[in-house]
């Protein structure tokens, strides 16, 4: 669990996301409250439930990006799902309980990587010994009277090979090693609601013939990686890991529910809205707190934090069923992006768009320099196209940048030297498309 303060979390999010202070503060406080709850006495800790968040804002303003960055900062089981993927129980599609099963899988993967990292050094030493055993097999004795090889000589030779192995001199040499056989994956089609049975059957088929080994011929570089992973997995207690992962999900799990507005009832329409409302009703017990059966045991969802987000173009937050609204008490509104925000998006974040394109073309010897007036012109054009057609927020910048640099990207292998992207260059490449509204609808 991350112990970063709210201020540190916001500063970290500022490196990648422009603006949206309210949303950043809300998720930072929610994440810090997870840590605060862990410091409480056990009796009081059980009573403190997370305050779930609903983020409201147009598309392309940073809702999903906040979730992606939060996943890296949280150091806790985290999963991002689209509400549109799920259907009411009885309809064809995934049921909402699979969210918790996927969250447990994510927790086990996270914990396994952490535990394998702790034993990595010992695993590398064990893998090194196995490679040396293949390179220097123990000599066979021909008969009862034959003299065994001198131990000091053997040890000295082994140390020489160990030194060469660590220096990378043997990396390209091929050897044959015995490794655990990879279980064959079996795809099982099951009716809706039977995903858990399919998962158990897959585990059963994979365990058939478990413990078998196979001989593989690999370069020492690749063999070392494979053997290190195998030795590390052997050193980790899998049963304890599963118990800890389930406990981690129950206490620290975070679920990001994207596109929640797509399952809201739109006005007085009927038909497919029945299923939409059904998804909301199925989400209620998860958000409120219930017990979900997974292949690793029962998981209680009382203390899992849910962050929902949606654009709410065609519906309003009040179109969600009242019970679900009550379970998302913290509302955060994200503002639409302006031309000034676009300028900052193009230049300020770590690995900004201009930096990415410059680095890509630098690989071919083309040095692209974005002038300040050129960046501002790109931002103005993106804003104008958003206003005249559909407003897709910062995603419009990707479209504009691709169109702007299309010719340079195509001619890059034959063109060496600097290229300056200023306002005149941007106008030359894009102005005609922007002026022609019909054309800009299709191309930009």
Curated annotation (Swiss-Prot):
GO terms for molecular function: ATP binding; ATP hydrolysis activity; peptidase activity; proteasome-activating activity. The keyword rRNA processing does not apply. SUPFAM superfamilies: P-loop containing nucleoside triphosphate hydrolases. ATP binds at residues 18, 60-65, 258, 323, 395. It is found in: Cytoplasm. GO terms for biological process: protein unfolding; proteolysis involved in protein catabolic process. SMART domains: AAA, ClpB_D2-small. CDD domains: RecA-like_HslU. The keyword ATP-binding applies. One of its GO terms (cellular component) is HslUV protease complex. It holds the Pfam family AAA_2. Its main location: cytoplasm. Disulfide bonds: none annotated. Coiled coil: none annotated. It comes from the Bacteria. Keywords: ATP-binding, Chaperone, Cytoplasm, Nucleotide-binding, Stress response. InterPro entries: AAA+_ATPase, ATP-dep_Clp_protease_ClpX, ATPase_AAA_core, Clp_ATPase_C, HslU, P-loop_NTPase. Gene3D superfamilies: 1.10.8.60, P-loop containing nucleotide triphosphate hydrolases (3.40.50.300). Belongs to the ClpX chaperone family. HslU subfamily. ATPase subunit of a proteasome-like degradation complex; this subunit has chaperone activity. The binding of ATP and its subsequent hydrolysis by HslU are essential for unfolding of protein substrates subsequently hydrolyzed by HslV. HslU recognizes the N-terminal part of its protein substrates and unfolds these before they are guided to HslV for hydrolysis. A double ring-shaped homohexamer of HslV is capped on each side by a ring-shaped HslU homohexamer. The assembly of the HslU/HslV complex is dependent on binding of ATP. HAMAP family: HslU. This is ATP-dependent protease ATPase subunit HslU. The lineage of its organism: Bacteria, Pseudomonadati, Pseudomonadota, Gammaproteobacteria, Chromatiales.
């Amino acid at each position: 669990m991350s112990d970063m303060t709210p201020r540190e979390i916001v500063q970290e999010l500022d490196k990648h996301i422009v603006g949206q202070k309210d949303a950043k503060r809300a998720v930072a406080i929610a994440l810090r409250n997870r840590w605060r709850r862990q410091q409480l006495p056990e009796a009081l800790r059980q009573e403190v439930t997370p305050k779930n968040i609903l983020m409201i804002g147009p598309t392309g303003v940073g809702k999903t990006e906040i979730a992606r960055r939060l996943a890296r900062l949280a150091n806790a089981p985290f999963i991002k799902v689209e509400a549109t993927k799920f259907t009411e129980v009885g309809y064809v599609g995934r049921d909402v309980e699979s969210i918790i099963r996927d969250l447990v899988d994510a927790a086990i993967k996270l914990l396994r990587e952490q535990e394998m990292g702790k034993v990595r050094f010992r695993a590398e030493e064990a893998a090194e010994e196995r490679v040396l055993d293949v390179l220097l097999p123990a000599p066979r004795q021909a008969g009862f009277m034959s003299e065994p090889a001198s131990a000091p000589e053997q040890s000295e030779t082994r140390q020489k090979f160990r030194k060469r192995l660590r220096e990378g001199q043997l990396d390209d040499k091929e050897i044959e090693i015995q490794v655990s056989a990879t279980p064959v994956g079996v795809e099982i089609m099951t009716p809706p609601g039977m995903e858990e049975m399919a998962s158990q059957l897959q585990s059963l088929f994979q365990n058939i013939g478990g413990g078998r080994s196979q001989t593989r011929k690999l370069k020492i570089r690749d063999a070392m990686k494979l053997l290190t992973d195998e030795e590390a997995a052997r050193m980790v207690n899998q049963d304890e890991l599963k118990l800890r992962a389930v406990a981690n999900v129950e206490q620290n799990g975070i679920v990001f529910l994207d596109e929640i507005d797509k399952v809201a009832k739109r006005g007085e329409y009927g038909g497919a809205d029945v299923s939409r409302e059904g998804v909301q009703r199925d989400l209620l017990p998860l958000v409120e707190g219930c017990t979900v059966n997974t292949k690793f045991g029962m998981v209680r969802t009382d203390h899992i934090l849910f962050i929902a987000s949606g654009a709410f173009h065609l519906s309003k937050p009040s179109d969600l069923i009242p019970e679900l609204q009550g379970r998302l008490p913290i509302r955060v509104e994200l503002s639409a992006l302006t031309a000034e925000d676009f300028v900052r998006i193009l230049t300020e974040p770590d690995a900004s768009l201009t930096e990415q394109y410059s680095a890509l073309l630098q690989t071919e010897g083309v040095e692209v320099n974005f002038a300040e007036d050129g960046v501002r012109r790109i931002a103005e054009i993106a804003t104008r196209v958003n206003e005249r057609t559909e407003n897709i927020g910062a995603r419009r910048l990707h479209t504009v940048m691709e169109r702007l640099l299309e010719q340079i990207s195509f001619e890059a292998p034959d063109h060496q030297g600097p290229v300056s992207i200023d306002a005149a260059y941007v106008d030359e490449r894009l102005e005609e498309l922007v002026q022609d509204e019909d054309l800009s609808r299709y191309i930009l």
